[in-house]
């Protein structure tokens, strides 16, 4: 016989039994045992609370006197707990997005704030942190070559509400937009430009395309910087491209060296040409003046020559010979002389041998067959000589 099944058990006819031998006397009137009555449970709870706080008697719940006070105390404690748990803090670099009953309400600033708990929901968002993502992969160029390109994008959150609720996942959306923009820009560029001189243009074009995508989708993000990390050809042709790049770098280096040499030597050559030009002009003027002086001197001697030609010729000859022999140490003696005693200053003659040859102060233009220009190796030694008014030459 099952438990609580009606039957004849030790004279308990028509009464329910339980395994402990107790009769279910509380279930009188022939009612079957079922789930507890909620009204009865609440009534019993109210009676217990009423008795504990001073309520007596009565079959129903008593809300007067001490029972009301007890409920008031419990309610006050619950309200206090609810109120104090509503305080929260937003960091200095954060902004809080408040949703009231699931609908956007406002954005709160950093500091201590309060919200009605279970009504408002606050999501803090860092708006000052610089975030980074990388896009890379094999990409097809305009000239149908394949390159491996890698690019880093740095960004931050400009609008917390748009960042959270305008798109499903703003970070993932930006990653996909970066990959798409980079592939579009690389697809419009030549491989040689990507590997060498066109990286700056690719970086600027990618950043401009990303800004257009962010504005069109209203993501609430701001691009801080775009860094072109690397671009390399496939491994199968990497050696050939490295040789081509090295040759191009050598070409650029040689061009820079040539430009530097030109910038160094051109001012020197220009200055030297100007100096030689001025010296030539000075020599021209000096030669003309000397010739005019000689002409004037001969014109002055012309009346004397016409009066006594032989005497004037002899005097001019002696003056010329004296001028010629004055710069030499050789002494000419007439062997047919009358034997007169000659005085020869040996010390002065020996001193003239040790002297360096000095240029003649007056030279005619016919004496200069050519002018020897200074060489570059002796330029420093002839700077002081070039300042003099008399130009040295060979004749």
Swiss-Prot record:
Oligomeric and partner information: HflC and HflK may interact to form a multimeric complex.
Pfam families membership: Band_7, HflK_N
Membrane-spanning intervals of the chain: 67-87
Keywords: Membrane, Transmembrane, Transmembrane helix
Stretches the record annotates as Disordered: 1-40, 352-395
Protein name: Protein HflK
Biased segments, Low complexity type: 1-26
Bilayer topology: Single-pass membrane protein
Cellular component aspect of the GO annotation: membrane
Function: HflC and HflK could encode or regulate a protease.
Native source species: Vibrio cholerae serotype O1 (strain ATCC 39315 / El Tor Inaba N16961)
Polar residues biased stretches: 353-395
InterPro entries: Band7/mec-2_domain (IPR050710), Band_7 (IPR001107), Band_7/SPFH_dom_sf (IPR036013), HflK (IPR010201), Membrane_HflK_N (IPR020980), Stomatin_HflK_fam (IPR001972)
Domain of life: Bacteria
């Amino acid at each position: 016989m099952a438990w609580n099944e009606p039957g004849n058990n030790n004279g308990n006819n028509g009464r329910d039994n339980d395994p402990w031998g107790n009769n279910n006397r509380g279930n009188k009137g022939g009612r079957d045992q079922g789930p507890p009555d909620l009204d009865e449970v609440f009534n019993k709870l109210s009676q217990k609370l009423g008795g504990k706080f001073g309520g007596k008697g009565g079959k129903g719940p008593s809300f007067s006197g001490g029972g009301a006070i007890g409920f008031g105390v419990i309610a006050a404690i619950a309200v206090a707990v609810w109120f104090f748990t509503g305080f929260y803090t937003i960091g200095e670099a954060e902004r809080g997005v408040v949703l009231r009953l699931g609908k956007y309400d406002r954005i709160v600033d950093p500091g201590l704030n309060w919200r009605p708990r279970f009504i408002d929901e606050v999501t803090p968002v860092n708006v000052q942190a610089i975030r980074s993502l990388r896009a890379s992969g094999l990409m097809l160029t305009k000239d149908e070559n394949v390159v491996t390109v890698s690019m880093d994008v740095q960004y931050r959150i400009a609008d917390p509400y748009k960042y959270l609720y305008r798109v499903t996942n703003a970070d993932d959306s930006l990653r996909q937009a970066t990959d798409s923009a980079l592939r579009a820009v690389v697809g419009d560029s030549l491989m040689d430009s990507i590997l060498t001189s066109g990286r700056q243009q690719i970086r600027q074009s990618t950043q401009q395309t990303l800004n257009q995508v962010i504005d069109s989708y209203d993501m609430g993000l701001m691009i801080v910087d775009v860094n072109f990390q690397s671009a390399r050809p496939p491994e199968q042709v990497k050696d050939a491209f490295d040789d081509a790049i090295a040759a191009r770098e050598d070409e650029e280096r040689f061009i820079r060296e040539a430009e530097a040499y030109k910038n160094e030597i051109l001012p020197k050559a220009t200055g030297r040409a100007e100096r030689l030009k001025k010296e030539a002009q000075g020599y021209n003027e000096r030669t003309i003046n000397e010739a005019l002086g000689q002409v004037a001197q001969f014109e002055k001697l012309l009346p004397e020559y016409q009066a006594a030609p032989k005497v004037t010729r002899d005097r001019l000859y002696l003056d010329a010979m004296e001028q010629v022999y004055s710069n030499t140490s050789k002494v000419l003696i007439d062997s047919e002389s009358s034997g007169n005693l000659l005085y020869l200053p040996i010390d002065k003659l020996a001193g003239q041998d040790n002297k360096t040859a000095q240029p003649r102060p007056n030279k005619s233009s016919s004496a200069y067959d050519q002018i020897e220009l200074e060489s570059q190796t002796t330029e420093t030694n002839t700077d002081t000589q070039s300042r003099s008014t008399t130009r040295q030459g060979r004749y």
